[in-house]
């Protein structure tokens, strides 16, 4: 991974190394796998700058690791659930090394989640990997970045996520889901309230940019 002066990643020339921000074990906090023990592999670098991003520390730095070293660390930390999440940053900026690594994880019996914005093509993601695609809404500042051809790569086990900071984001997400018939394409469509950038402490309702009860009320009124 090459780093641009502003920290935005771009695809690197062929290399045997990846740029890794952190690898750790915790409980999954998002998607339909929330609450499950999980090993997180956070890759360094992102080509987007969402206004509410809470992982800006992954834009820069990190350490170089070979795919073999990453796999060994995952094996060492192995969660009892066998769940791994590949996240970032934007993991697909390191597609060349990441794709075979994910395939190896799947072949070794792991359940692998790939969290991605869908800004980069996803056609090379191994079919056994569960894509959790975070389609950016307008208030993120990156609302036109989703690679629309990625809709054709979606599988029934995949999930689509929208981070909502206000009514306009909700309407965008609703219309996108209906227009592209997402309910028939994926396992789950997730609406998540955005949190204030730099908010300290726990992720609770007081830090939300939109009240979760308000979001729920609008959602139920539409259905």
Give the label of every model feature segment.
Residues 28, 32, 58-59, 152:
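N-terminal/domain-start segments enriched in small and hydrophobic, helix-friendly residues
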Residues 93-223:
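Conserved AdoMet/S-adenosylmethionine-binding subsite of the radical SAM
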């Amino acid at each position: 991974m090459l780093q641009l002066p502003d920290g935005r990643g771009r695809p690197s020339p062929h290399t045997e190394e990846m740029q890794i921000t952190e690898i750790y074990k915790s409980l999954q906090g998002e998607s339909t796998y929330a609450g499950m023990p999980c090993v997180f592999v956070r890759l360094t670098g992102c080509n987007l700058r969402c206004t509410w991003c809470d992982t800006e520390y992954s834009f820069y730095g990190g350490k170089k690791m070979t795919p073999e070293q990453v796999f060994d660390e995952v094996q060492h930390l192995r969660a009892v659930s066998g769940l791994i999440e590949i996240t970032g940053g934007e993991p697909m900026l390191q597609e060349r090394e990441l794709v075979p690594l994910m395939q190896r994880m799947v072949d070794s019996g792991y359940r692998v989640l790939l969290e991605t914005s869908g800004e980069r093509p996803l056609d090379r993601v191994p079919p056994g990997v569960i894509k959790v695609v975070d389609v950016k809404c307008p208030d993120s500042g990156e609302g036109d970045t989703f690679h629309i051809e990625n809709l054709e790569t979606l599988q029934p086990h995949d999930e689509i996520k929208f981070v909502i900071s206000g009514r306009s984001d909700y309407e965008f997400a609703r219309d996108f889901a209906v227009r592209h018939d997402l309910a028939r394409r994926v396992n789950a469509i997730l609406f998540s309230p955005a949190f204030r950038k730099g908010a300290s402490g726990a992720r609770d309702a007081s830090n939300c940019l939109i009240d979760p009860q308000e979001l729920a009320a609008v959602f139920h009124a539409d259905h």
